[in-house]
């Protein structure tokens, strides 16, 4: 099946060890409706020899029922897994696929192109390192191209590959490729991606997807797969500012007290002097414990347990940073917010805000402006609707550690949770922390006020505070 099938058959331990050492690249495909996103992923899997024979046979059978490619196998059916997607020939939900080559491991997020699924795309893009934006060579840059480029930029994706697809339908015209390239360059001036690539391709026939095509002799660049295998992403991670959100306090016996979590950014070493926020108490890292034994240092992405030389008060939701860090606490911040609920957002309504492992009540105090993701124009709004993106002022009841999202994606992101249904209704990216303000109580629902009164009446020993 794959490039490593022989190694799997002869030495599974060697294969697993080699696979574990490979660097992981997460990327998403996005573009206008029917630009060929799912077909491109199917082509990547097919040409990388990552499809089993029975899968290929099933797709060949489904092509006669749902396919849109005539006599050719519709590789998009490898990815469009929902029955509604196959019947409509579109992508609705974010579809994830996993594959690897000799050089890297990959997780692909195939995101929907329709405007009503903007929230789905934002979800898929939030963990990606690279975006593949497809453009139909016949139509050029479309409204949805602008929207997806803006969302990719907003969510901190630094590497963008503009895949100008269906070049076979314009006879692999170099002038058409250059025209679309210039049009996108004009668009990207306001988005400032760190790295931008352009590839002419035909996902249906495989031109410049995995292998360089003979039908584009005028193109001297890399194929899409070559770009995916070689793009430099290690430097994208914040290795300077140590951030460790505490997820769990591990106390199996009286002789051990460790703080479990995943290093969000930076590096920590045994002997480093650290500080716990919000308390501000300091101590020294005594040991770094993992399932496989103790480490001398831990870096971004590693799940570890820290033990400290001193008994200081740390609980779930606290943040451990280096002692000399100038990180400040704030209960007020300015942020981009993607609204994901059918119920509109009005300033002043109480929600829960989750930053890493920290959860605190708060409100959106003000909507500064809404961004039209199709034109990039700004407008004043009194409420946010489903799929809206706006810059807002958030006020929290407790102070939190937050970094600018563009500087640190792990500690600059947050989600908004409905207090009654526990459903995630928004995703936020911090722009900057503002000076702390007096904690705001927000607007409570009639049910919350009545429940609070009931608790205070019948359970006075709980010391519940009056609300509303």
Curated annotation (Swiss-Prot):
In residue numbers, the region (G1) covers 31-38
Where is the region G3?
Answer: 110-113
> Mind listing the UniProt keywords for this protein, alphabetically?
ATP-binding, GTP-binding, Nucleotide-binding, Nucleotidyltransferase, Transferase
> Which parts of this chain are annotated as the region G2?
89-93
Please list the residues that bind GTP.
31-38, 110-114, 165-168
- Name the domain of life this protein comes from: Bacteria
Residues covered by the tr-type G domain: 22-239
Question: Where does this protein act, in terms of pathway?
Answer: Sulfur metabolism; hydrogen sulfide biosynthesis; sulfite from sulfate: step 1/3
Is Membrane given among the entry's keywords? no
* Region listing for G4, in residue ranges: 165-168
Q: Where is this region: G5?
A: 202-204
Listed GO molecular functions?
A: ATP binding; GTP binding; GTPase activity; guanosine tetraphosphate binding; sulfate adenylyltransferase (ATP) activity
Indicate the segments annotated as coiled coil, or none if absent. none
Catalytic reactions of this protein: sulfate + ATP + H(+) = adenosine 5'-phosphosulfate + diphosphate
Which InterPro entries does this chain map to? CysN_GTP-bd, CysN_II, CysN_NoDQ_III, EFTu-like_2, G_TR_CS, GTP-eEF1A_C, P-loop_NTPase, Small_GTP-bd
State which Enzyme Commission number(s) the record gives. Answer: 2.7.7.4
User: Which one GO biological process term can you cite for this protein?
Assistant: hydrogen sulfide biosynthetic process
| Primary role | With CysD forms the ATP sulfurylase (ATPS) that catalyzes the adenylation of sulfate producing adenosine 5'-phosphosulfate (APS) and diphosphate, the first enzymatic step in sulfur assimilation pathway. APS synthesis involves the formation of a high-energy phosphoric-sulfuric acid anhydride bond driven by GTP hydrolysis by CysN coupled to ATP hydrolysis by CysD.
Q: Tell me, how does this one assemble?
A: Heterodimer composed of CysD, the smaller subunit, and CysN.
Q: Family assignment?
A: Belongs to the TRAFAC class translation factor GTPase superfamily. Classic translation factor GTPase family. CysN/NodQ subfamily.
What's the name of the protein?
Sulfate adenylyltransferase subunit 1
State the species of origin. Teredinibacter turnerae (strain ATCC 39867 / T7901)
């Amino acid at each position: 099946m794959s490039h490593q099938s022989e190694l799997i058959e002869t030495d599974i331990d060697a294969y697993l060890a080699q696979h574990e050492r490979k660097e992981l690249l997460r990327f998403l495909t996005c573009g206008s409706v029917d630009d060929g996103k799912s077909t491109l992923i199917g082509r990547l899997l097919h040409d990388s020899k990552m499809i089993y024979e029975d899968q290929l046979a099933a797709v060949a059978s489904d092509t006669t029922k749902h396919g849109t490619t005539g006599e050719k196998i519709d590789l998009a059916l490898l990815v469009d897994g929902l029955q509604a997607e196959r019947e409509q020939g579109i992508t609705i939900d974010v579809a994830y696929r996993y594959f690897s080559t000799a050089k890297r491991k990959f997780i692909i997020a195939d995101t929907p192109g329709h405007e009503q699924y903007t929230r789905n795309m934002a979800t898929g893009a939030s963990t990606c390192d690279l975006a593949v934006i497809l453009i139909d060579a016949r139509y050029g840059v479309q409204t949805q191209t602008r929207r997806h480029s803006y969302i990719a930029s907003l969510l901190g994706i630094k590497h963008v590959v503009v895949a100008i697809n269906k070049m076979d339908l314009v006879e692999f015209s170099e002038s058409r490729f250059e025209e679309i390239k210039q049009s996108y360059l004009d668009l990207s001036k306001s988005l400032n991606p760190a790295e931008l690539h352009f590839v002419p391709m035909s996902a249906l026939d495989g031109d410049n997807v995995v292998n360089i095509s003979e039908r584009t002799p005028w193109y001297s660049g890399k194929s899409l797969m070559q770009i995916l295998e070689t793009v430099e992403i290690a430097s994208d991670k914040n290795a300077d500012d140590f951030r460790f959100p505490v997820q769990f306090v591990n106390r199996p016996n009286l002789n051990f007290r460790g703080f479990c979590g995943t290093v969000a950014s930076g590096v920590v070493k045994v002997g480093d002097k650290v500080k716990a926020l919000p308390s501000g108490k300091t101590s020294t890292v005594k040991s770094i414990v993992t399932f496989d034994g103790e480490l001398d240092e831990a870096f971004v992405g590693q799940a570890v347990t820290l033990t400290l030389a001193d008994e200081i008060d740390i609980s779930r939701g606290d943040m451990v940073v280096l002692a000399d860090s100038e990180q400040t606490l704030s209960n007020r911040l300015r942020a981009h917010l993607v609204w994901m609920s059918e119920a509109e957002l009005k300033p002043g309504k109480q929600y829960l805000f989750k930053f890493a492992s920290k959860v605190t009540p708060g409100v959106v105090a003000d909507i500064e402006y809404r961004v039209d993701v199709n034109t990039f124009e700004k407008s004043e709004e009194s409420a946010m609707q489903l799929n809206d993106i706006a810059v807002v002022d958030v006020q929290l009841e407790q102070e939190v550690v937050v970094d600018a999202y563009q500087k640190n994606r792990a500690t600059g992101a947050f989600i908004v949770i409905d207090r009654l249904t526990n459903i995630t209704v928004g995703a936020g990216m911090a722009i900057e922390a503002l000076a702390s303000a007096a904690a705001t109580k927000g607007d409570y629902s009639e049910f919350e006020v009545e429940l609070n009164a009931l608790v205070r009446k019948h359970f006075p020993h709980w010391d519940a505070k009056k609300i509303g």
